[in-house]
Amino acid sequence: MPKRNDIKTILVIGSGPIIIGQAAEFDYAGTQACLALKEEGYRVILVNSNPATIMTDKEIADKVYIEPLTHDFIARIIRKEQPDALLPTLGGQTGLNMAIQLHESGVLQDNNVQLLGTELTSIQQAEDREMFRTLMNDLNVPVPESDIVNTVEQAFKFKEQVGYPLIVRPAFTMGGTGGGICHNDEELHEIVSNGLHYSPATQCLLEKSIAGFKEIEYEVMRDKNDNAIVVCNMENIDPVGIHTGDSIVVAPSQTLSDVEYQMLRDVSLKVIRALGIEGGCNVQLALDPHSFDYYIIEVNPRVSRSSALASKATGYPIAKLAAKIAVGLTLDEMLNPITGTSYAAFEPTLDYVISKIPRFPFDKFEKGERELGTQMKATGEVMAIGRTYEESLLKAIRSLEYGVHHLGLPNGESFDLDYIKERISHQDDERLFFIGEAIRRGTTLEEIHNMTQIDYFFLHKFQNIIDIEHQLKEHQGDLEYLKYAKDYGFSDKTIAHRFNMTEEEVYQLRMENDIKPVYKMVDTCAAEFESSTPYYYGTYETENESIVTDKEKILVLGSGPIRIGQGVEFDYATVHAVWAIQKAGYEAIIVNNNPETVSTDFSISDKLYFEPLTEEDVMNIINLEKPKGVVVQFGGQTAINLADKLAKHGVKILGTSLENLNRAEDRKEFEALLRKINVPQPQGKTATSPEEALANAAEIGYPVVVRPSYVLGGRAMEIVDNDKELENYMTQAVKASPEHPVLVDRYLTGKEIEVDAICDGETVIIPGIMEHIERAGVHSGDSIAVYPPQTLTEDELATLEDYTIKLAKGINIIGLINIQFVIAHDGVYVLEVNPRSSRTVPFLSKITDIPMAQLAMRAIIGEKLTDMGYQEGVQPYAEGVFVKAPVFSFNKLKNVDITLGPEMKSTGEVMGKDTTLEKALFKGLTGSGVEVKDHGTVLMTVSDKDKEEVVKLAQRLNEVGYKILATSGTANKLAEYDIPAEVVGKIGGENDLLTRIQNGDVQIVINTMTKGKEVERDGFQIRRTTVENGIPCLTSLDTANALTNVIESMTFTMRQM
């Protein structure tokens, strides 16, 4: 069937900012889909609010709108552009929910817009828990005993019938938002009321828990002629009860008999046929390990996290083909892009094993609740490919960058066995490592199975890994055992530990005896057809399939899994760098391990190595490919941290040299440089012990900022006000030592400014200067950034330009540099310098049309910026005002304090652009999920040091008609200035403020930190209550001020004569 030619223009909705449950996989899917539709000759219009994506580049669609993903804004775009059709299944849950709202409000009908791909009725049938259950009953497909509730009372009625444990699943949400497992009345009350709040339909499904069953997923495709195939089936190692996004997953499934595999395959295809899915779809099933009983858990009628994983696991481009199916093409008429000879209707076959392990943010949020359940908590994931299950698992573990390299924790031997078993019996993110530790201590597999319900097949594999460890210990230095361990994925580091050697010695031993990996191709067909995809994984076998060309090559290191502080922005820069390398005539090679991203799409680079980003794994590739050099400045801290390790092996680091990278990172050298070029920084000292830190602080004067050297995303950074807090920090937060000193700096309050620049060694160009709304002290990734600066004087701008040029040339940057300044009352100071690509590169590139990562890469290859037509200094400003607003995922993370500070907490970002600052801020805030209302009630409770400042704010909010609630201290202050405020009680008292928040009486909360134990706990409870109830809580008065400006611009002020 040929494609449809009754439609010309297609609107694609992206998935918005990265949050837990909706990460980079949608950038990958959206990019693929837009390109696929353009390839078929359609005009594509894209709307997405996330500037950090490849998808929002002008090359990807014919028209790109970076606007908030809300009904009103998308409706405006539809009215303006008049598209013929809308493709909603590539924007995650956000895209689906938007399509449903636009249909229900009549916008699609009024503008004659058709929905492409899966019919709306099918989407609703899959997403609405009631309709789905009815359909399954008609098909005779078993679903767990369940009930739909719209109130907490109904939930308790159902509990009377089936008892605990119960699983709560809110309708029309993703990543299990608001859901959970309940074991008692208290949990049932809390989780159901939460779930009803987060569900757009105020509807929850309660089901009898089948925790302990095997969780199996099928990724399926269907077209309009009813051709349907299974692209990939996957098995969760963790049984049902842990969200699939938080589970360790293996593909293909390992423990199903052929009968079970075919039974579940038939059910999956039966269900998508009954739903009438056109495109990709993910089916989750639960299988009883002791019988052929199964249940269907849920169906996602769209491209998902699992489909990105399935695409990378098989090489079969699901999103690309789903987009083509949506415009009428069928599976039996589209060629599989990997083989180029077989059709897309052939099911892929794997001759390898892949493991996916989620990446959690608990290294950032040590107090966060680690226990895993049906609500997702991981920010990203890694994938690894091997020829044995053990190999793929161990490669995935060392891709995580937790400092773990193996099946066990770095300090594993220090725990006693009872503690280890206690940790295994709870499902949390470290359980896998504790299982390894328990097996090492001789705990039986039966005991572990009883605690975890993990299949014996996997437990035997873990046992095998531990057995090999013991054999290595008994045969130190034995080459046979070295080879054997390599077959099962052991790293040199682990072998070195057991051999009692250094990692370097094991590496040399391998080189001398020619024990090196070969690289196998991922070809979708287990080598059945000829294939020429440049997509490889390493393994210790005999035949190497990666043919080395004689072209000059440049190797680019990717940024690994998405985590807080290192998001999709670095993948964006990686992809642009690759494009620049190819344009310059070199062969571009990528090494990365994140299955969600555009950079690991095999069609982007000349060669893709899907491997861990460790010294050993990267060196193996370099030894084979012998590139001209390696580029480290686009892969975040992951890549920068590998620079000196690779250089020791004689590898050429392209761009800013290793010694210059160190000059920017090493405190002493950096201070010397600043003195030489005459750029001031806040007074600071280094401390290697708590005593030294106290002496430093006494000299500098409080408040001081303390942090370890060499970190990204402000890990373990704090602002402290006195000796007691400093002592606390030095003893609990960090282990200071001569190798790892702690930096103690004077804390300057003032405007924070961020600048990105590109330098080729002679010329420095500055695409833009951004001003932060929050004053210094809030991490730059969590601040609202504004371009162009709104409140700086000509002198300040000139000084910033001058200092940036001096710094770039002084460090001798080749490529990108990111600098943060603070403007205090007595001038401009430099806060920090990052000699690499930064979080703001995509944002600035989009605004200014200066392809920063590409220019930086061209400079690294040796081209000159002046030859490209750029002049030194700040580039001409783009028209309009642009803001970058942070987006947080606190509703998924319990026990995490949402107060903004020097440690980064946001998972993503949105952009707002318009003609005035207020309009741009309105879009930025709306896009980030803060609903801006022109009237309502604000609750103020601020620390003593902020009481003066809050008066002005209260006055303005009062004038635009906001009602003010305040705690007694704040209310008394307001009364002095005749500002009316209703006094609310402290926690636990009469008219308690938490109850007011829970009852929905409050639209905005303004709360600033007070230090001191009891008060801190109160503040923490207030802030968490706002999160659980979905109310914006501003912990910085600067953000509150900006919000007030926006409210004033939307409304009229009422003042008496």
Swiss-Prot record:
MF term (GO), any: metal ion binding
Binding site for Mn(2+) 2: 298, 300
Chain intervals for the UniProt region annotation (Carboxyphosphate synthetic domain): 1-401
SUPFAM superfamilies documented for this protein: Carbamoyl phosphate synthetase, large subunit connection domain, Glutathione synthetase ATP-binding domain-like, Methylglyoxal synthase-like, PreATP-grasp domain
Region listing for Allosteric domain, in residue ranges: 930-1057
UniProt-annotated binding residues for ATP 1: 129, 169, 175-176, 208, 210, 215, 241-243, 284, 298
Gene Ontology CC terms: cytoplasm
Enzyme class label: ligase
Magnesium recorded as keyword: yes
Endpoints of the signal sequence: none
Residues annotated as binding Mn(2+) 1: 284, 298
Catalytic activity from the UniProt record: hydrogencarbonate + L-glutamine + 2 ATP + H2O = carbamoyl phosphate + L-glutamate + 2 ADP + phosphate + 2 H(+)
Binding site for Mg(2+) 2: 298, 300
PANTHER family: CARBAMOYL-PHOSPHATE SYNTHASE [AMMONIA], MITOCHONDRIAL, CARBAMOYLTRANSFERASE FAMILY MEMBER
Subunit (UniProt): Composed of two chains; the small (or glutamine) chain promotes the hydrolysis of glutamine to ammonia, which is used by the large (or ammonia) chain to synthesize carbamoyl phosphate. Tetramer of heterodimers (alpha,beta)4.
UniProt comment concerning the protein's domains: The large subunit is composed of 2 ATP-grasp domains that are involved in binding the 2 ATP molecules needed for carbamoyl phosphate synthesis. The N-terminal ATP-grasp domain (referred to as the carboxyphosphate synthetic component) catalyzes the ATP-dependent phosphorylation of hydrogencarbonate to carboxyphosphate and the subsequent nucleophilic attack by ammonia to form a carbamate intermediate.
Function: Large subunit of the glutamine-dependent carbamoyl phosphate synthetase (CPSase). CPSase catalyzes the formation of carbamoyl phosphate from the ammonia moiety of glutamine, carbonate, and phosphate donated by ATP, constituting the first step of 2 biosynthetic pathways, one leading to arginine and/or urea and the other to pyrimidine nucleotides.
NCBIfam families hit by this protein: CPSaseII_lrg, PRK05294.1, PRK12815.1
Protein's name according to its UniProt entry: Carbamoyl phosphate synthase large chain
Species this protein is from: Staphylococcus aureus (strain MW2)
The gene coding this protein: carB
